[in-house]
Amino acid sequence: MIYKKERHIELLKRSQDLKNQGKNLFRENPEAYSELLNYEIAIEEQVFWTHRGEFFLVMKNFLDNIINFDEFETAFTLLYLKTREEFDVFVIDLKQIEKFQPSTRSDRFAGYINTIFREFEAVEDECCTEQEVKYYVKEAYLKFSCFYIV
């Protein structure tokens, strides 16, 4: 996706205007809504990427058996929720968006982080094991560690 800041701002303003009228962009213009979501994904990737050092440290400690699965789940979840809150504020802040420039290195990082977070529920539901989560964490860690060394 080619990031177009002016278009992103235009879509966000339109979405906010519709929301103030009790309407939503999805119902009014599904294509524009989809385009706005793509811009929001770019922001999500970047926000999570800015916290990559913290995520990598928690992941490395888990992979190196410094912390156990329960400790990993707690530390990762707290970091995830903090980062998600930051994203929720950023995604509607026009001043932040005006300064925003996505990084190609962050591509799909948030997707991996979101998947790890969802895996905790899968373990609770006995859909996967702690070892399977660890394998996925290792895969994500290795994929992105070339961009950041802990």
Describe each region flagged by the PLM:
Residues M1-V150:
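Acidic, Ser/Pro/Thr-rich low-complexity regulatory regions
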